């Protein structure tokens, strides 16, 4: 099926129309009051603490909608859930059952007790923190690497290594639809309005489908190389994509134009997260820092130092706390640092 191609994104300065750089893109004159205020806050809250979570590297972290819990998924085939208590994470439970690595997980958008995990064992599992049990195991056709829950809570989409995306009814746990794509599917996401479905792909494109019809709406040439991750801001104004070209591009949801780029990272952008107010964007890669930018200007607000590549970042849904996980070294390389920790930045320096 032919998909209308839009003009290039960050690479085509000066053009206008869907999928192009907006003409009002400009360099800001100096730090905004928001940036100065947040920098002041982080000067007193720049502490990062590590919390043991798994026996192998952590691939994914995510907060429940109420911010009370953080879940992590790991190469050790388990998920862990922590309770956030003041300035620390307290491990509540470890969730076993998958037969292979847990590559991605996400929470129900409005029920803080349910989360879902995607695994290479060709299943997804829905878990309930109240009973600490798996309430559903759904068999899928391939090794699952991407998962997201629709904003209305009714559907779970899961993508596998064969570029098949399956849409699963969150109540009946049955497959509602399945799409095989002819390109490498990376991250997947609904828009906040639940009426469009976005995929980032290996050709640097963002593919947009109508939902629930799953008919192609547009294909945006967003980056010259592999488009890896995508996130929507909680306010519904923007979405951001991260690419193998080390750029993060910010897009206007309604106009589908690229508003600005963030270019402080040197390595492929693996993971993104917007803060709860939509004003900060964290992005991370194999660089040994996480970039925190002000969304409206692209200005650097802060950087969080880390000793190894970062796999996953997630802002807390109510507070300026950033959870993340890195490629921790196993004991045989460096016995002082454990594999499988979850990290929390934004804690008071005196905590």
From Swiss-Prot:
InterPro entries: G-protein_beta_WD-40_rep, Tex1/THOC3, WD40/YVTN_repeat-like_dom_sf, WD40_repeat_dom_sf, WD40_rpt. The keyword Transmembrane does not apply. GO terms for cellular component: chromosome, telomeric region; nuclear speck; THO complex part of transcription export complex. Keywords: Acetylation, mRNA processing, mRNA splicing, mRNA transport, Nucleus, Repeat, RNA-binding, Transport, WD repeat. Residues 7-21 have a biased composition (Low complexity). WD repeats lie at residues 53-94, 97-137, 139-178, 180-221, 222-261, 264-303. The modification N-acetylalanine is found at residue 2. It is found in: Nucleus; Nucleus speckle. Pfam families: Beta-prop_THOC3. Belongs to the THOC3 family. Component of the THO subcomplex, which is composed of THOC1, THOC2, THOC3, THOC5, THOC6 and THOC7. The THO subcomplex interacts with DDX39B to form the THO-DDX39B complex which multimerizes into a 28-subunit tetrameric assembly. Component of the transcription/export (TREX) complex at least composed of ALYREF/THOC4, DDX39B, SARNP/CIP29, CHTOP and the THO subcomplex; in the complex interacts with THOC2. TREX seems to have a dynamic structure involving ATP-dependent remodeling. Component of the THO subcomplex of the TREX complex which is thought to couple mRNA transcription, processing and nuclear export, and which specifically associates with spliced mRNA and not with unspliced pre-mRNA. Required for efficient export of polyadenylated RNA and spliced mRNA. The THOC1-THOC2-THOC3 core complex alone is sufficient to bind export factor NXF1-NXT1 and promote ATPase activity of DDX39B. This is THO complex subunit 3. The lineage of its organism: Eukaryota, Metazoa, Chordata, Craniata, Vertebrata.
């Amino acid at each position: 099926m032919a998909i209308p191609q839009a003009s290039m994104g960050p690479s085509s300065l000066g053009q206008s129309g869907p999928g192009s750089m907006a003409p009002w893109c400009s360099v800001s004159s100096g730090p905004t009051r928001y940036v100065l205020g947040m920098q002041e806050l982080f000067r007193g809250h720049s502490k990062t603490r590590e919390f043991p979570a798994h026996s192998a590297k952590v691939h994914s972290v995510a907060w429940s909608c109420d911010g009370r819990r953080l879940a992590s998924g790991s190469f050790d085939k388990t998920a862990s859930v922590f309770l956030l208590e003041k300035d620390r994470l307290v491990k509540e439970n470890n969730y076993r059952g998958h037969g292979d690595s847990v590559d991605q997980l996400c929470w129900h958008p409005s029920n803080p007790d349910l989360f879902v995990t995607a695994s290479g064992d060709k299943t997804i599992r829905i878990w309930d923190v109240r009973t600490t049990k798996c309430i559903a195991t759904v068999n899928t056709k391939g090794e699952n690497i991407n998962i997201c829950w629709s904003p209305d809570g009714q559907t779970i989409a899961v993508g596998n290594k064969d570029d098949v995306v399956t849409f699963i009814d969150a109540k009946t746990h049955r497959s509602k639809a399945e799409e095989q794509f002819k390109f490498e599917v990376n991250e997947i996401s609904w828009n906040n309005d639940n009426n469009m479905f976005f995929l980032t792909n290996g050709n640097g494109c963002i593919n947009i489908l109508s939902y629930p019809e799953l008919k192609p709406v547009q294909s945006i040439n967003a980056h010259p190389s592999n488009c890896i991750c995508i996130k929507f801001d909680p306010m519904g104004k923007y979405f951001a994509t991260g690419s193998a070209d080390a750029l993060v591009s910010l897009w206007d949801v309604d106009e589908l134009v690229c508003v600005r780029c963030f270019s402080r990272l040197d390595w492929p952008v693996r993971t993104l997260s917007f803060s709860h107010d939509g004003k900060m964007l964290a992005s991370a890669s194999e660089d040994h820092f996480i970039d925190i930018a002000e969304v409206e200007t692209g200005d650097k607000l802060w950087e969080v130092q880390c000793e190894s590549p970062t796999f996953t970042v997630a802002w807390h849904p109510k507070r300026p706390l950033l959870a993340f996980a890195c490629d921790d070294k196993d004991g045989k390389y460096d016995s002082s640092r454990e594999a499988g920790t979850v990290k929390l930045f934004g804690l008071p320096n005196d905590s």
